[in-house]
Structure formats: structure tokens, C-alpha cells
Amino acid sequence: MKPSGLTLAFLVVFMMAIMYNSVQAEALADADAEAFAEAGVKELFGKAWGLVKKHLPKACGLMGYVKQ
């Protein structure tokens, strides 16, 4: 028994829908991971910059570059 053209068209559209959903779900997961990574980097940079601002004047003063 040979499948009709309508059956083949339905299967093609169905497979395209499945592929589209899988690609879209993967893109959303990548976007979420990227957002979390950026937030972590910004937080880490903020902490590091706070430490630099806290300790750099003391270090420069000890080396004689900045008079306190």
C-alpha cells in the first residue's frame, strides 16, 4: 500500500514542527545560560573592583606612589 500525497505532506509538516520546537527550546536554554553567565561575571567583576578600590590606595602608599 502506497501512502498518499496528503499523508506525506502531513508528515513533512509534522517533522518540521518538531524540529522547530527543538531548535527553539535549545535557543532559549542557551539564552538563559548566557544571562546567568553574564550576571555571574558582572557580580564577580564588581567584587574584584571593590577589592581593588579598597586595597590599591594602601598598596600605592606603601610603595611611595601616593602620599597619604
Curated annotation (Swiss-Prot):
User: Is the keyword Oxidoreductase in the record?
Assistant: no
Signal peptide feature range: 1-25
Give any Gene Ontology cellular component: extracellular region
Q: How is it modified after translation?
A: Truncated sequences of this peptide have also been found in the venom. It is possible they have been cleaved in the venom.
Which tissues does the record link to its expression?
Expressed by the venom gland.
Q: Does the keyword Kinase apply?
A: no
Which keywords annotate this record?
Answer: Antibiotic, Antimicrobial, Disulfide bond, Fungicide, Secreted, Signal
Q: Which ranges are cleaved off as propeptide? A: 26-39
Q: Which GO terms describe its biological process?
A: defense response to bacterium; defense response to fungus; killing of cells of another organism
Where does the record place it?
A: Secreted
Top-level taxon of the source organism: Eukaryota
Instruction: Please give the family membership noted in the entry.
Output: Belongs to the formicidae venom precursor-01 superfamily.
What does the record give as the function of this protein? This homodimer composed of two cationic amphipathic alpha-helical peptides has antimicrobial activities against E.coli, S.aureus (MIC=3.1 uM), and S.cerevisiae (MIC=3.1 uM). It also shows histamine-releasing activity (66.4% at 10 uM) and a weak hemolytic activity (10.5% at 50 uM).
UniProt subunit comment:
Homo- or heterodimer with PLP4 (AC A0A348G5W0); disulfide-linked.
Please give the name of this protein: U-poneritoxin(01)-Om4b
